[in-house]
């Protein structure tokens, strides 16, 4: 893999996907160092991807699904501002939650953040609906994750 291809991948991929990937890998992180890399590294890679895409002419990232064209990445100046805010918040959440030792809570927190960032950058209503619902599902599991009587109420 060359540096140019890596830079192209970062610039043309929805930044939320990097946080979602970190969320999916978190349950398999067994030690503190790997958890820290995923909890903070996922949002930082998303931040690098967002900044590297600023000012470039980005090709829309589209996928054909059931006869529909899903636009998975459509950056503009407004989504840049909101995406930047979401990514910074998710990095701060990652740093703040390093004191916990619960892989489920960490994973659902990053899943929620990644789905929120993904929703900011998608370019069609179907993809927006999917990302929005993923935030709803992640928030339910975030509430239930502590597995205590308070979370069941």
Task: Please annotate each region the language model reported.
Residues 2-107:
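Transmembrane helix-loop-helix hairpins at membrane boundaries of multipass inner-membrane proteins
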Residues 32, 107-111, 115-153:
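Alpha-helical multi-pass transmembrane bundles of energy-transducing inner-membrane proteins
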């Amino acid at each position: 893999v060359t540096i140019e291809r890596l830079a192209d991948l970062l610039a043309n991929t929805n930044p939320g996907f990097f946080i979602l990937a970190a969320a999916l890998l978190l349950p398999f992180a067994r030690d503190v160092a790997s958890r820290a890399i995923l909890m903070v590294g996922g949002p930082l890679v998303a931040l690098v991807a967002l900044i590297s895409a600023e000012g470039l002419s980005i090709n829309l990232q589209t996928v054909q699904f059931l006869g529909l064209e899903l636009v998975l990445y459509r950056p503009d100046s407004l989504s840049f501002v909101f995406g930047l805010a979401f990514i910074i918040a998710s990095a701060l959440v990652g740093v703040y939650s390093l004191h916990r030792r619960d892989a489920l809570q960490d994973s659902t927190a990053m899943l929620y953040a990644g789905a929120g960032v993904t929703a900011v950058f998608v370019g069609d209503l179907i993809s927006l609906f999917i990302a929005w619902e993923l935030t709803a599902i992640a928030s339910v599991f975030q509430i239930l994750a502590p597995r205590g009587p308070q979370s069941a109420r």
